[in-house]
Amino acid sequence: MAMTVHCDIVSAEGEIFSGLVEMVVAHGELGDLGIALGHAPLITNLKPGPIRLIKQGGEAEVFYISGGFLEVQPNMVKVLADTVQRAADLDEASAQEAVKAAEKALNEKGADFDYGSAAARLAEAAAQLRTVQQIRKKFGG
């Protein structure tokens, strides 16, 4: 039997996942992180993108988060996310439209233009689209 760690994924809407996993793979502020049992304690920011859980038996489950924090303790991993969606629920066409809308907003700067907000919307939409495309490429869906 593989060694596991307890993982919780929570957002403002509530608990999204709680269970034992062999590994958690997330996109941290300084790059990708792979967390397994025995990982050193850690708290880090998470960028928008996929969170991949490798469950017991090797089954993978993927979620999209819009950002948040990751806390690692000796027997527990906790993801505190701004928003979470199961990757299977993401729609590629909607993600592409969001990228186009964000790019258009960046190109059509008005008097009250907020560059930081527009850039954040573009980064989130692009991360969501990347997540959908990665899943389609890996699982052929």
From Swiss-Prot:
It is found in: Cell inner membrane. The keyword Zinc does not apply. The keyword Ion transport applies. Disulfide bonds: none annotated. It comes from Pseudomonas fluorescens (strain ATCC BAA-477 / NRRL B-23932 / Pf-5). F-type ATPases have 2 components, CF(1) - the catalytic core - and CF(0) - the membrane proton channel. CF(1) has five subunits: alpha(3), beta(3), gamma(1), delta(1), epsilon(1). CF(0) has three main subunits: a, b and c. This is ATP synthase epsilon chain. Its main location: membrane. GO terms for molecular function: ATP binding; proton-transporting ATP synthase activity, rotational mechanism. Produces ATP from ADP in the presence of a proton gradient across the membrane. InterPro entries: ATP_F1_dsu/esu_C_sf, ATP_synth_F1_dsu/esu, ATP_synth_F1_dsu/esu_N, ATP_synth_F1_esu_C, ATPsynth_dsu/esu_N. PANTHER family: ATP SYNTHASE DELTA/EPSILON CHAIN, ATP SYNTHASE EPSILON CHAIN, CHLOROPLASTIC. Pfam families: ATP-synt_DE, ATP-synt_DE_N. Belongs to the ATPase epsilon chain family. GO terms for cellular component: plasma membrane; proton-transporting ATP synthase complex. Keywords: ATP synthesis, Cell inner membrane, Cell membrane, CF(1), Hydrogen ion transport, Ion transport, Membrane, Transport. It is a peripheral membrane protein.
